Amino acid sequence: MRRRKESTLMQQITPFLWFDTQAEEAANYYVSIFPNSRILKIARYGEAGPGPRDSVMTVSFEINGQQFTALNGGPQFRFSEAISFVVNCETQAEIDALWGRLSAGGKEDRCGWLKDRYGLSWQLVPTVLPELLGDKDSARAQRAMQAMLQMRKLDIAALRRAHQGSG
């Protein structure tokens, strides 16, 4: 029996974000918000178009080791809540800082969701949330869930109090 040889190549998934004309602006915005982030490459349209010659076509950027590509593709497509980026946050200070920056000019929603100024959906999730919602004591888990459903920006202390039955 032959064994399949393990591949030494590692697949990497790169989210490809379609903007109308704001790819460079959005990429600069995102790298300004998250630590360990940078612009990697900017490609421009040539004579073949479809964008104006020398205008930005794509911007490759990195957020904390995860690569993204932003495209100036025109107005045909818009972002929706069907796709969102989850940011796992250790502390309330991290949630507060990211919430303030990402929601500025955008729209806050329930349960830690927001849309940024470009319409991209984000979820700012405390790393403790799966533990609270997955508690084997269903009453505790239910209290944490009910508290979360009432929140926009998630509040770790309030979630813990609800989980314990003291809030």
What are these regions (language model features)?
Residues 15-18, 84-90:
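Short, well-ordered beta-strand elements within core beta-sheets of diverse protein domains
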Residues 10-13, 56:
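Short N-terminal signal/transit or membrane-insertion segments
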Residues 56, 80-82:
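Short, solvent-exposed loop/turn segments at the edges of secondary structure
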Residues 48-50, 79, 137:
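Short secondary-structure boundary/hinge segments and terminal tails
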Residues 2-11, 40, 62, 69-73, ...:
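Vicinal oxygen chelate
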Residues 17-65:
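Core segments of cupin and vicinal oxygen chelate
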